[in-house]
Amino acid sequence: MKILIFIIASFMLIGVECKEGYPMGRNGCKIPCAINDNICKVECQAKWKQSDGYCYSWGLSCYCTNLLEDAEVWDSSNNKCVG
């Protein structure tokens, strides 16, 4: 029985995914970048210590990975960008 519980728990852990998204600046807009991953990595880690970041070339904006579920990221449905 313990083995069965262990196997089920293992499958649940394998499927765990972290939140991802665009970090927002003070004005509510995405943080712009131009092919420089270091800037984005610094921005993401300044807001969320455990995160990683890179410059998403298609959108020319920083993109953060490994975020906590309650992390506030830019969302097109409730865009508050004023810049």
Swiss-Prot record:
Main subcellular location: secreted
Known tissue expression: Expressed by the venom gland.
Subcellular location: Secreted
Ranges for domain LCN-type CS-alpha/beta: 19-82
Cystine connections: 29-81, 33-55, 40-62, 44-64
GO MF annotations, alphabetized: sodium channel inhibitor activity; toxin activity
Protein keywords: Disulfide bond, Ion channel impairing toxin, Neurotoxin, Secreted, Signal, Toxin, Voltage-gated sodium channel impairing toxin
Matches recorded under CDD domains: neurotoxins_LC_scorpion (cd23106)
Pfam families for the chain: Toxin_3
A GO CC annotation given for this chain: extracellular region
Signal peptide: 1-18
Record-linked InterPro entries: LCN-type_CS_alpha_beta_dom, Scorpion_toxin-like_sf, Scorpion_toxinL, Scorpion_toxinL/defensin
Family the UniProt entry places it in: Belongs to the long (4 C-C) scorpion toxin superfamily. Sodium channel inhibitor family. Beta subfamily.
UniProt note: domains: Has the structural arrangement of an alpha-helix connected to antiparallel beta-sheets by disulfide bonds (CS-alpha/beta).
Its job: Beta toxins bind voltage-independently at site-4 of sodium channels (Nav) and shift the voltage of activation toward more negative potentials thereby affecting sodium channel activation and promoting spontaneous and repetitive firing.
Name of the protein in its database record: Putative beta-neurotoxin RjAa15f
Organism expressing this protein natively: Rhopalurus junceus (Caribbean blue scorpion)
Lineage summary: Eukaryota, Metazoa, Ecdysozoa, Arthropoda, Chelicerata
